[in-house]
Regions:
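Serine-hydrolase catalytic core recognition
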Residues: 152, 214, 350-653
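Beta-propeller folds
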Residues: 5-342, 346-350, 358-359, 367-369
Length: 653
């Protein structure tokens, strides 16, 4: 029985059944040609984030914030910058204590190899920054990362008169990783001390939090194998570890992503995140290590913790309890875990709490609403409509966006897809169809927001007469631990099986031309694109793979070893998932696109695949963006997506 205050049967649900059946039967009504005629056409300058008109073609955004408990628009009153300001520049830490004061340099030996105050462990484990200000703002903790033992990847800067070497420290799977220590700087005494972590070789430290009284530091430690994690407490004054609050083991992997959150009315208790019951949930813990209760439970995941309402003694969260494609806001009673829905039960919601947690800015969208803002009283549950963004695409020939579900390759699990149809769609015609894929962990492509979360490039392609199909396979996020971990030690294999279930579904639709199937993806999606092109060479006619992983032994330590173990521990898995041996199977037209200075999926991947194709006598196409990283910045993104589009226009249409 659900503990949610509002009965689930009465909650608005995603309207999936009808459209799913329509998709299976191909029962899409033909577009009204007269309605489409005379409508304006999109360009990539309208749709792409690097386009000149992208902002005016996006739903209107309000910059709202709370000044204590008063709602303020940043266009009227800018949010003031808090002090002290602590930041990292040129790998050193700087401190500015007041407006107009001279910044003080706190560290002096920062370099490419020794970095202070920056995100470590390659931004894994939820690490987004490297400086952590105390509650009193009298001290801050910071990371120090030593990369001197890490192998360099030789990136080259070709922008000058003579090209120069600008290497990246890049720890590949199974190789030496960097070492991280944690410092504490006291602003008042201007002194630095260090946590006594011992030998930090092959240890990861994440989710740093100050205790409510600033006397202790809480952090999670993860071993190199990423099978064990502990929540440890360090005394700030001595730097010594004083206790371990919690331990967790998983035979596949653990992945702490969130710091603990102390109750503002009782600093002896805090909330911890864990997937130990199979889904991401919240647990109420005491500072002496006792688990008081599991606050949330069920076959759904908690997505965010926004803060607390002191008046109702509740924690405010978002979760996908109503439907896997939704994100809704709840107040959860600390005393008993009882959940109360705070929004309209539809779509995807994000919240910003007032200082005391009694009011909430609820920003949301649904498949039919571009963006909206409600103000919610978390105590009385009264919702007030604040703003509705007009449709920025009014007057344009807009495609049809549909959502449905199919079964995964296991025959049991529901997988959700989005389909995008041309504005002038005619069910009696046959359309070239492109499968857009990502497929990897920590991402999803389908959700119940505007146009079912469609990417703007899909709109552009549909306008040109293509059907687009996007499926979230097993291994993607927000569906629970088993759903994600099915890919462990053999990345890409179950994902391909699920994507081919999607292809089988497409082949049942009378308007999909099975002889003109294409596939496109970037990063993990680039890996999936080449995997599908070479494992199913008679299915896909054209593919465009951006920034593709080719062999996981060339990918970085933290991510690669979490999902694949090391090449020494899992030689069969690395051999099975490498695309080098698949180069000989390439039959269709494949374009590979990379940034020449990609620090995430280094160019070695694509270059080695090209070499394998040369040896095998197969003929992929290749395009490189000089000086660009894993994604193309600014207006170069418009050029990129025009190039991707043209490749399908040349060889699929």
């Amino acid at each position: 029985m659900s503990e949610t205050a509002m009965a689930q049967d009465n909650m608005p649900m995603v309207e999936k059944t009808v459209c799913a059946e329509e998709c299976r039967a191909g029962n899409f009504a033909a577009a009204d040609d007269d309605a489409v005629a005379g409508k304006k056409q999109f360009t990539l300058e309208d749709l792409n984030f690097g386009g000149k008109r992208y902002r005016e073609m996006s739903p209107k955004t309000l910059r709202l914030w709370w000044k204590e408990n008063t709602l303020v628009n940043a266009d009227t009153l800018a949010k003031p910058k808090g002090y002290p300001q602590v930041y990292s520049r040129d790998h050193n830490i700087f401190l500015q204590t007041a407006v107009g004061s001279e910044p003080q340099q706190i560290t002096a030996d920062g370099s490419r190899q020794i970095q202070y105050g920056e995100a470590v462990h390659r931004n894994e484990f939820g690490i987004m920054n490297g400086i952590f200000l105390s509650n009193s703002k009298q001290s801050f903790a910071f990371y120090r990362m030593d990369q001197s033992m890490v192998t360099d990847y030789p990136q080259v800067n070709t922008s000058g008169r003579v090209a120069t070497l600008e290497p990246d420290a890049y720890p590949m799977a199974g190789m030496k990783s960097h070492k991280v220590t944690i410092g504490i700087y006291n602003i008042t005494t201007q002194t630095t001390s260090w946590l006594d972590l011992g030998d930090v070789t092959d240890r990861y430290f994440t989710n740093i939090t100050w205790s409510a009284d600033d006397k202790e530091i809480y952090l999670f430690e993860v071993n190199r194998d990423q099978t064990d994690m502990s929540l440890d407490v360090y005394d700030v004054a001595s730097g010594k570890k004083v206790r371990t609050i919690y331990r967790e083991h998983d035979d596949k992997y653990v992945e702490p992503l969130h710091p603990v959150s102390f109750l503002p009315w009782d600093s002896s208790k805090f909330i911890m995140w864990s997937q130990k019951d199979g889904y991401t949930h919240l647990y109420l813990m005491s500072t002496d290590g006792k688990m008081i209760r599991q606050l949330t439970k069920g076959e759904f995941v908690v997505l965010d913790l926004l803060g607390f309402c002191k008046k109702t003694k509740s924690v405010i969260i978002s979760s996908n309890e109503i439907h896997p494609l939704q994100s809704n806001l709840y107040a959860v009673k600390i005393q008993n875990g009882r959940r109360t829905l705070l929004d309209n039960g539809k779509g995807v919601h994000y919240g910003i709490l007032s200082d005391d947690g009694t009011h909430l800015i609820d920003t949301y969208s649904t498949p039919d609403i571009p963006r909206a803002y409600d103000i919610t009283n978390t105590v009385t549950l009264k919702r007030t409509e604040h703003f509705r963004s007009p449709d920025p695409w009014q007057g344009y020939a807009v495609p049809t966006y549909k959502m449905g579900s199919i079964k995964a390759a296991d025959g049991v699990t529901d997988l959700y897809y989005r389909m995008v149809l041309p504005p002038d769609f005619d069910a009696q015609k046959k359309y070239p169809t492109v499968v857009y894929v990502y497929g990897g962990p920590h991402a999803h492509n389908v959700q119940a927001s505007w146009h079912w979360y469609s990417r703007s490039w899909e709109t552009y392609m549909a306008q040109k007469g293509y059907v687009l199909f996007i499926l979230d396979n097993r291994g993607s996020e927000n569906r629970g631990k088993d759903f994600e971990q099915v890919t462990f030690r053999h990345l890409g294999q179950e994902e391909m099986r699920d994507q081919m279930c999607g292809v089988d579904f497409l082949k049942t639709l009378p308007y999909v031309d099975a002889e003109r199937l294409g596939v496109h993806g970037w990063s993990y999606g680039g890996y999936m694109t080449i995997s599908l092109m070479t494992n199913y060479p008679d299915v896909f006619k054209v593919g465009v793979a951006g920034g593709p992983v080719i062999d996981w032994k060339w990918y970085e330590v933290m991510y690669g070893e979490r999902y694949m173990d090391t090449p020494e521990q899992n030689p069969e898995g690395y051999a099975q998932t490498s695309l080098l041996r698949q180069a000989k199977n390439l039959k269709g037209k494949l374009q590979i696109i990379i940034g020449m200075n990609d620090p995430t999926v280094v160019p070695q991947h694509a270059l080695q695949f090209l070499d394998a194709c040369i040896e095998a006598g197969t003929q992929p196409d290749f395009f490189v963006y000089p000086g660009q990283g894993h994604n193309m910045a600014g207006h170069k993104s418009v050029h990129l997506h025009e190039r991707i589009t043209q490749y399908f226009e040349d060889y699929l249409k």
